[in-house]
Amino acid sequence: MSKEFSRTQRVSQQLQKELAMILQREVRDSRLGMVTISDVEVSRDLAYAKVFVTFLCVGEQTPESCLAALREHEVHIRMMLGKRIRLRLTPEIRFYYDNTLVEGMRMSNLVSEVVNEDKRKQQDSGREEDQAGEE
């Protein structure tokens, strides 16, 4: 009987849940805005965790400035995480900006532009055929 989830996947899910709670309730930094954890990748030995985040930036905030502010809290967040989870070693946390949402929107816009361009060309060629048929 095989396991449905590997240990790294279970730890990854637990880390994502706990990190979301920590960021929401315990990290007080106005530079962060609203932080969403989109994914957590844990190394096989559970020593390292890549945390992918997105931000809802307000006003002067940029994703880069929010990420820099979040990275200042890495050590403190790891300490709080160590108190909440039962692992022999608390993973070293590294935060990365997750731009998949931005890239997805960009790709969607490109597809929409191509479809609209194609429709316009079809309409133009249809008008040319109508004009040729009238003559």
UniProtKB/Swiss-Prot annotation:
User: Where located?
Assistant: Cytoplasm
Highest taxon of the lineage: Bacteria
Q: Which UniProt keywords apply?
A: Cytoplasm, Ribosome biogenesis
* PROSITE patterns in UniProt: RBFA (PS01319)
In its UniProt record, which GO terms are filed under biological process? maturation of SSU-rRNA
Give any Pfam family that matches. RBFA
Keyword Cytoplasm listed? The answer is: yes
- Name one cellular component (GO) term: cytosol
Where does the record place Basic and acidic residues bias? 116-135
Region Disordered, residue ranges: 115-135
Q: Which InterPro entries match?
A: KH_dom-like_a/b, RbfA, RbfA_dom_sf, Ribosome-bd_factorA_CS
GO terms for molecular function, please? Answer: ribosomal small subunit binding
What does the record note on quaternary structure? Monomer. Binds 30S ribosomal subunits, but not 50S ribosomal subunits or 70S ribosomes.
Task of the protein: One of several proteins that assist in the late maturation steps of the functional core of the 30S ribosomal subunit. Associates with free 30S ribosomal subunits (but not with 30S subunits that are part of 70S ribosomes or polysomes). Required for efficient processing of 16S rRNA. May interact with the 5'-terminal helix region of 16S rRNA.
* Assigned protein family: Belongs to the RbfA family.
Query: Would you tell me the protein name for this molecule?
Result: Ribosome-binding factor A
Species this protein is from? Vibrio campbellii (strain ATCC BAA-1116)
